[in-house]
Amino acid sequence: MGNSKAYPVLRTDDARTAYTQARRLCALLEQEDEVWLTAELRTAGEVRRMAALLPGGTFDHTRTRTDPVTGRYVEFDLDVTTADDAALEAHLPLDLTEEVPAGNVVARFAKALGDGAAAIEWHGRWPDVPAADHDGSPPYDGVQVVFHGDRAQRGRWTEEHTVFVHVTKFGDLSRARKLAAHIGGEVLGEAQLGW
């Protein structure tokens, strides 16, 4: 199967602009019904906001933790809706990963984010363009906005937010350029390993 190729097409220090431009690209995408959300939560308040927004969301330690005596993996098993701040703070930072139906929750998720790295992924299929020899590639195509990051795969924290277009595992620079032009942008460097 392999991974998509992810082309960065916008970098900005304004999260709202990144989200808005990603949504403009989504208008060109034959979207799947589900959207992937991920976030690094650094405060108890952020955890509570996300728990209220995404009841039943999957929370886990950002970094692997092991028991100092047994060496076994320590799972995160607190109920984030009932744990007090002190209990939550002992486990921070936490990761949230959730697949949700496309809809209003995605915009609310973007507004509720804190300063940790986060991403929204819209998977789907770019339309076929026979004249340009572009075929949609459903396992690979899509749009991703990464908040506080410049890598399609998790990387270092940055001040900036990056929008990626994902295409076939073989890459499609021509399509990426056309998609970037749709939002008044351009391809900003080499293709990265995508989803």
Regions found by a protein language model. Name each.
Residues M1-W195:
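Structured alpha/beta or helical-core interaction and ligand-binding surfaces enriched in interleaved
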